[in-house]
Amino acid sequence: MSNQITYFATAARGFEEMLKIELEQICGADGKVVQGGVHFTTNQKGAYQALLHSRLASRILLPLVSTKIFSDLDLYATIIAINWADIFDPRDTFYVDFNGTNREIRNTQFGAMRVKDGIVDYFERKRFARPIVDKDRPDIRIHVYLDREKLIVSLDLSGEALHMRGYREDTGKAPLRETLAAIIVLRSGWQKGTPLVDPMCGSGTLLIEAAQMQAGIVPQLQRKYWGFNAWKGHQQAIWQQVLEEAHSQKNTQIDPLFYGFDLDHRVLAKAKQNAQNAGVAHLIHWQQADIAALKNPCLDQKGTLVSNPPYGERLGTTPALIALYSVFGQRLKQQFAGWNVSIFSGEPSLLNCLRLRSTRQFKAKNGPLDCLQKNYQIAEYAIHNQHISESSVAQNTQVAPDFANRLTKNIKKIEKWAKQQQLDAYRLYDADLPEYNFAVDRYSDHIVIQEYAAPKSIEQNKARQRLLDAVTATLHVTGIETNKLVLKVRQKQKGTNQYEKLANKGEYFYVNEYGAKLWVNLTDYLDTGIFLDHRLTRKMVGQMAKGKTFLNLFAYTGSATIHAALHGAKATTSVDMSNTYLNWAEQNLELNGLKSRNHRLFQADCLQWLAECRERFELIFVDPPTFSNSKRMEDSWDVQRDHIKLMTQLKRILTSDGMIVFSNNKRGFKMDFNGLTALGLVAENISYKTLPLDFERDPHIHNCWIIRHIEN
């Protein structure tokens, strides 16, 4: 038992130093930290203790061979030279975990196959039975590590990964591994014997790990399946001694100072069952509660609050998360004065929404996500004012005050005007302040924040934080519910991505615009269904269309068609390449009671349809994209380059006294007057007449022209 052997404990990156300390405490081992784990020297009892007691190690490996190889032949020769009969019986199943590559062995599956071949061939040459490979639960697991020419072959004494404690039946959404939960608790600064609160406990892993620490329950006490069970070097007597010592160290005389809260009663039920399985159900108080109503369960004691709040990988979840973290920060100040707080998040910028100053921070990985854990000390003074109001907390922690003040000012001006104009959809803010490069639009009782893509010179994290601040301030100023705020990142459109779905919520509602009802969808597409800056253009087109035949080319969702039809157009024709948007246009017609044979919809490449058109129209509205290279179009389209080609075709189908309303959003667009004259057309720039009050800050957002035959 006194023979000293060097083992290797693997760990997630960033855990190594704490694992070294833990191993010293468990078995007195002298450890050496390397990336991905700790080499530690101990006897066999110490190895068993490490397997049973470690909360941070992923696996414990017993190295068999360490050598240099250059090819798969070297690998095979090394494996077949190992005396496998001294390690396991050929009647036992085995499996090979192969990690790493080099110039010759470029695939881990190939490497694992060569190791497997070497082991099988060894036994067959010794005239033993051929051992069977079992991927799911092998008796023996061989671990192979290859880094360039360095090869290490080890016996995995763990069997299954050590984060699998056995108490979790259902992990729910986005679970924390038990090893990660343990290190979060250890890094939080929590002291045994003091209260520990998790206000968003989910499946309860943080609290269960801490409660087991407090109760002296070793993490692997319930495990039956081990990687050493079939190992010929296993010493059952020593193992039994280690087990008995582990059982004897349980502490049953401890106070139940663990508190778990969660809004979801189903998740809470799973947490309770997990705690029961882990043997700590009697130590943890569970309660269904909303974070907005979070109360300190131990006002007469100082303790630690630790949590892993939800975080979304999709940007669309951000407004709700910002509100969650903001309210969370307020409740911490109100209820947990003098406490230690430790929050772990996969979206580090959300931690800034807590409006707390951290004392320490730690990086960690949760699967592929780069995460951050921040520790805070809540100021003592707040405990003397437990009845501080939420509004005063919000005022004291107001974010982006310049942005908030400008938004408030704009709302007072624009909403009064919008009410007079019978408008439900309008712009409230349009990058008024350079450092807050956003647009804020109201659609009835919803708000859409469009972030203009930041230039490359702006640090991504800084732009992201300003975006979060803007969302927080907008929620505060407008008072809307978080589920009615939509966040979008506006980038340069490439090809057809204006038609691509961003989500699939299917949430439509209609807005009023000068008496027209128009369906909008704020989440599923890059655009919402109406272009707000063209509002006056649509109104003007409607007034011009009375008693006329009307063509809406590049019709989008048909909003201009609705205005034309409501104002008494004789007949309307709407053409767009997107079937999605034409269906939308059809729904708009139906919503306004306009569905009839006089209002036709065509799904087609607009330019191709135009070339084949034999009808003539008295009023044509054309609002083409700035650029398009859609696969559904025969050629690419550039409005600056191709607008005369477009006018050539439009003139052919325009009646002698007809008019074309031509608009586009290309900044710096230059009308080719000579080209128009050669066609017998003349253009009048009416852009200034079509710019509504809420877009006055950006007079170049679109340009608009009325084009006629010269003789008219």
UniProtKB/Swiss-Prot annotation:
It catalyses: guanosine(2445) in 23S rRNA + S-adenosyl-L-methionine = N(2)-methylguanosine(2445) in 23S rRNA + S-adenosyl-L-homocysteine + H(+); guanosine(2069) in 23S rRNA + S-adenosyl-L-methionine = N(2)-methylguanosine(2069) in 23S rRNA + S-adenosyl-L-homocysteine + H(+). It comes from the Bacteria. It is found in: Cytoplasm. It is an enzyme of class 2 (transferase). InterPro entries: 23SrRNA_methyltr_KL (IPR017244), DNA_methylase_N6_adenine_CS (IPR002052), RlmKL-like_Mtase (IPR000241), RlmKL-like_Mtase_CS (IPR053943), RlmL_1st (IPR054170), SAM-dep_methyl-trfase (IPR019614), SAM-dependent_MTases_sf (IPR029063), THUMP_dom (IPR004114). Its main location: cytoplasm. One of its GO terms (cellular component) is cytoplasm. PROSITE patterns: THUMP, UPF0020. Residues 46-157 form the THUMP domain. Belongs to the methyltransferase superfamily. RlmKL family. Its EC number is 2.1.1.173, 2.1.1.264. SUPFAM superfamilies: S-adenosyl-L-methionine-dependent methyltransferases. GO terms for molecular function: 23S rRNA (guanine(2445)-N(2))-methyltransferase activity; RNA binding; rRNA (guanine-N7-)-methyltransferase activity. Keywords: Cytoplasm, Methyltransferase, RNA-binding, rRNA processing, S-adenosyl-L-methionine, Transferase. Specifically methylates the guanine in position 2445 (m2G2445) and the guanine in position 2069 (m7G2069) of 23S rRNA. This is Ribosomal RNA large subunit methyltransferase K/L. HAMAP family: 23SrRNA_methyltr_KL.
